[in-house]
């Protein structure tokens, strides 16, 4: 019985201490979730890991489009020639990211175009990875979580934190939606 294993690498990037994930299978087929790498050093650290592990990235999957989660999208898209996937309700948030970048002091941020819009409960299959897209709005209008059912792993973006829940004091956030998503 061959039982494939998935591997998960977490990076903490940018002044917001955002978590970026690389998830890949034994054959090296993988995805990057929420690339927040902004500085040259962060991008070099990311590239070094991908190269050392010989990972073939196939897609960028974003839980949402707040500035801390999108700072590295343009870099990753251009470096690895892979598509960006995002929920359609995040479009206004992504469109506002250039303004947010200026407000928060990221002058070199480049917004990236979305290549594929998520559908609710979509299953993304890449190599041995089967990733279910769960619509969990509240922290952001089109926030999604990624559920690796077989492994019982959820990557929830900013829905939950240790002993806390995601903030809802940003534009387009909704506390009631967040509570319903968590349930």
State what each model feature region is:
Residues 37-43, 47-125:
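Active-site HxH/HxHxD metal-binding segment of metal-dependent hydrolases
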Residues 4-53, 145-157:
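Conserved beta-strand hairpin/beta-sheet module of binuclear metal-dependent hydrolase folds
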Residues 11, 23, 120-127:
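Short acidic-hydrophobic surface loop/beta-edge motif
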Residues 11-13, 107-108, 113-115, 135-137:
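Short Gly/Pro-enriched turn/cap motifs at secondary-structure boundaries
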Residues 37-38, 100, 129-183:
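Metallo-beta-lactamase
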Residues 23, 63, 136:
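Conserved S/T- and glycine-rich ATP-binding loop of Class I adenylate-forming
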Residues 30, 60, 83, 135, ...:
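Hydrophobic "anchor" residues on beta-strands that sit immediately upstream
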Residues 2-7, 102-106, 127-128:
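Short Pro/Gly-enriched beta-strand edge/turn motifs at strand-loop
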């Amino acid at each position: 019985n061959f039982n494939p294993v998935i591997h998960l690498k977490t990076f903490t990037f940018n002044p917001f201490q955002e978590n970026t994930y690389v998830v890949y299978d034994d054959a090296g087929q993988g995805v990057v979730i929420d690339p927040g790498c902004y500085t040259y050093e962060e991008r070099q650290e990311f590239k070094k890991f991908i190269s050392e592990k010989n990972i073939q990235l196939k897609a960028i999957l974003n839980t949402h489009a707040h500035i801390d989660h999108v700072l590295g999208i343009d870099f990753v898209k251009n470096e690895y020639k892979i598509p960006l996937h995002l929920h359609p309700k995040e479009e206004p948030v992504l469109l506002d990211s250039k303004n947010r970048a200026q407000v928060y002091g990221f002058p070199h941020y480049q917004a990236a175009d979305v290549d594929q819009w998520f559908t609710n409960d979509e299953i993304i299959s890449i190599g041995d990875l089967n990733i279910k897209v769960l619509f969990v709005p509240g922290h952001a209008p089109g926030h999604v979580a990624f559920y690796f059912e077989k492994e019982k792993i959820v990557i929830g973006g900013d829905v939950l934190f240790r002993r806390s829940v995601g903030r809802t004091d940003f534009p387009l956030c909704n506390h009631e939606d967040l509570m319903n998503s968590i349930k």
